[in-house]
Amino acid sequence: LWQAPAHSEGQGMSEVRAGDAFAVYGLLRAGESGFAQFGLEQAFAPLGPCLLTGRLYDLGAYPGLVEGEGQVVGEIFEVRDPSVMPRVDAFEDYWPQDPARSRYERRKVRLIEPDRDAWVYVWVLGVEGARLIESGDWFKR
């Protein structure tokens, strides 16, 4: 069951604001290449582990979260500096002005734990041939 946010703000087209929660599950997790590349230790304040609803697929060099039943392990942060988001969107191949080019979409979803809304990147292309990560944890693939 894909959990919709408590209040929808047009899904991926809304602006990320300072104070918003952001959940990550792959290369943007602490210790991974994307986290360091964008200086997220300054832009994002860590809030701890989180669980998201969905399925996680190994897409080669990175994972993709797709809608569906299951749990995905991630980390939740509070956004301190939203000016980093256009660069992070580009890294995630999310183009808000040109969705047809996008591999991911940034959406606000309801987390399983903690029980709150958070932004997350959701894979929007097919997963044919990709391996399901049964544990739901990119670090335990």
What are these model-predicted stretches?
Residues W2-P5, E9, M13-R141:
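Glycine-aromatic micro-motifs
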